[in-house]
């Protein structure tokens, strides 16, 4: 079981991160099933920013699904495409970007995200992630004989990278996406005013 003791359940946005968020880009990182796309869409509405999902952008440009890319090009090919999309989107302004769960595996991606805007890590427990992803066949990394164990392995590998990259860590498991997005929007707006 993964402990959540070190993660504050409340949203706490202060100083420079809040300023970047109010005037620039916001990048959501976290595991598959953490709510990046759902919360990102809602947050973009509340903050009047344009929403992008890096996986959807890759699918639009290639014309095929993520599992198909994994099948043809492998994870390495997919990660290369992911870095290209992130690099392009770094030139955009006033956006909210939901990244793929593995975007932080690349040091180049972590640096781009960290310096390109405010990075928010949506963190959820393994149980919550499993509940949200267990029936989803569009998760190539979970197409194994023991997908829950694979999810736990990925979490252990990626959690430190998300933390390293993030300016803000938010527990996403127990709150509704709408409530979480509203809370984030309010805190980011307040922080940008009080600096």
UniProtKB/Swiss-Prot annotation:
Annotated catalysed reactions: shikimate + ATP = 3-phosphoshikimate + ADP + H(+)
Organism: Nitrosospira multiformis (strain ATCC 25196 / NCIMB 11849 / C 71)
Its job: Catalyzes the specific phosphorylation of the 3-hydroxyl group of shikimic acid using ATP as a cosubstrate.
Gene this chain is encoded by: aroK
Keywords, alphabetical: Amino-acid biosynthesis, Aromatic amino acid biosynthesis, ATP-binding, Cytoplasm, Kinase, Magnesium, Metal-binding, Nucleotide-binding, Transferase
PANTHER family in the record: SHIKIMATE KINASE (PTHR21087), SHIKIMATE KINASE 1, CHLOROPLASTIC (PTHR21087:SF16)
Binding residues for Mg(2+): 37
Subcellular location as annotated: Cytoplasm
Name listed for the protein in its UniProt record: Shikimate kinase
Residue numbers binding substrate: 55, 79, 101, 158
CDD domains the UniProt entry points to: SK (cd00464)
Subunit structure: Monomer.
Necessary cofactors: Mg(2+)
The organism's taxonomic lineage, starting at the top: Bacteria, Pseudomonadati, Pseudomonadota, Betaproteobacteria, Nitrosomonadales
Binding of ATP, residues: 33-38, 139, 175
Enzyme class: transferase
UniProt-listed SUPFAM superfamilies: P-loop containing nucleoside triphosphate hydrolases
Single GO biological process annotation from the record: amino acid biosynthetic process
């Amino acid at each position: 079981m993964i402990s959540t003791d070190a993660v504050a359940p409340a949203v706490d946005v202060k100083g420079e991160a809040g300023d970047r968020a109010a005037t620039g880009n916001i990048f959501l990182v976290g595991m598959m099933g953490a709510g990046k796309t759902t919360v990102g869409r809602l947050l973009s509405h509340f903050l009047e920013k344009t929403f992008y999902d890096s996986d959807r952008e890759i699918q639009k440009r290639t014309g095929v699904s993520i599992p198909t890319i994994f099948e043809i090009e492998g994870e390495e090919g997919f990660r290369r495409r992911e870095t290209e999309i992130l690099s392009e989107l770094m030139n955009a302004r006033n956006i909210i970007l939901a990244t793929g769960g593995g975007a932080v595996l690349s040091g180049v991606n972590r640096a781009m995200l960290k310096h390109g805007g405010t990075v928010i890590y949506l963190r959820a427990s393994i149980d919550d992630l499993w509940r949200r992803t267990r029936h989803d066949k569009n998760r190539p990394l979970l197409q194994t004989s023991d997908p829950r164990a694979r999810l736990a392995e990925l979490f252990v590998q990626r959690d430190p990278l998300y933390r390293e990259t993030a300016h803000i860590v938010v527990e996403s498991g127990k709150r509704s996406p709408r409530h979480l997005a509203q809370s984030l929007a309010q805190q980011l707006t307040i922080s940008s005013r009080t600096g």
